[in-house]
Amino acid sequence: MTNKITERITGHTELIGLIATPIRHSLSPTMHNEAFAKLGLDYVYLAFEVGDKELKDVVQGFRAMNLRGWNVSMPNKTNIHKYLDKLSPAAELVGAVNTVVNDDGVLTGHITDGTGYMRALKEAGHDIIGKKMTICGAGGAATAICIQAALDGVKEISIFNRKDDFYANAEKTVEKINSKTDCKAQLFDIEDHEQLRKEIAESVIFTNATGVGMKPFEGETLLPSADMLRPELIVSDVVYKPTKTRLLEIAEEQGCQTLNGLGMMLWQGAKAFEIWTHKEMPVDYIKEILF
């Protein structure tokens, strides 16, 4: 077994990709290529800078080149379904896709963000089942987290977002959760700071599921005041680069338990790996490399 890329790639090697922007910070190529090499699988994983304008053409190109599959990240998660053939039940419910698999020319979209997030919490020893959470965000990752949390048994979810293009998506998420699960979901404007303070005070966990904290918003946070946090609160961030966002720095200063996005990235990636290869990712080995 060798990790030398020149010795691994042959005329039979299949390509798996990642499409997003920004993309150069991603640890997914390292994670998946190390896992492929460890298991002796003839795949290679590459990252491609792709936004809204290029998305349709890129999917058509990937289809024509018969890629085995690819991951999807911001800002493409909620738009790519238009160019696929099928969606998994979870992706249909969430309305977002972060993993595509090509089975004999049929492109199927999956979503693994929600299960990845909940698994990361469990691995870190945090139990939020039957309790209340407050989350910022209304994009693909935030939606997947909210719906999976509701399906898993979280009692109440308070969602905060700016009144932008994603706000309507959050309204749909609230409707789905309230109609299809036993969880109570509510939506608020992120500018309503007093409401945010109230919801955080009633929650066991506060989560940032937006891109605020990573480039080009590194050093920023949606939290208007540090005194909204308390020592017994869990504060999590889906951002993993930097590994300690401004939000997590503030949370640590307030004595909170914190969790960055590395665990979620690992476990959502492990599920995607299984979808493409029908093999389990060597998670313990990958943890040694990434953590």
Swiss-Prot record:
Catalytic class of the enzyme: oxidoreductase
GO MF annotations, alphabetized: NADP binding; shikimate 3-dehydrogenase (NADP+) activity
Active site, UniProt feature: 77 (proton acceptor)
EC number: 1.1.1.25
GO term, biological process aspect, one: shikimate metabolic process
Residues reported to bind NAD(+): 161-164
Reactions it catalyzes: shikimate + NADP(+) = 3-dehydroshikimate + NADPH + H(+)
Residue numbers binding shikimate: 26-28, 73, 98, 113, 240
Biological or metabolic pathway of the protein: Metabolic intermediate biosynthesis; chorismate biosynthesis; chorismate from D-erythrose 4-phosphate and phosphoenolpyruvate: step 4/7
Superkingdom field: Bacteria
InterPro entries (UniProt xref): Aminoacid_DH-like_N_sf (IPR046346), NAD(P)-bd_dom_sf (IPR036291), SDH_C (IPR041121), Shikimate_DH (IPR011342), Shikimate_DH-bd_N (IPR013708), Shikimate_DH_fam (IPR022893)
Keywords attached to this entry: Amino-acid biosynthesis, Aromatic amino acid biosynthesis, NADP, Oxidoreductase
Pfam family, one: SDH_C
Residues given in the record as NADP(+) binding sites: 137-141, 214, 238, 261
Assembly: Homodimer or homotetramer.
Function: Involved in the biosynthesis of the chorismate, which leads to the biosynthesis of aromatic amino acids. Catalyzes the reversible NADPH linked reduction of 3-dehydroshikimate (DHSA) to yield shikimate (SA).
Protein family according to the UniProt entry: Belongs to the shikimate dehydrogenase family.
Protein name per its UniProtKB record: Shikimate dehydrogenase (NADP(+))
Organism: Listeria monocytogenes serovar 1/2a (strain ATCC BAA-679 / EGD-e)
Origin organism lineage: Bacteria, Bacillati, Bacillota, Bacilli, Bacillales
Gene: aroE
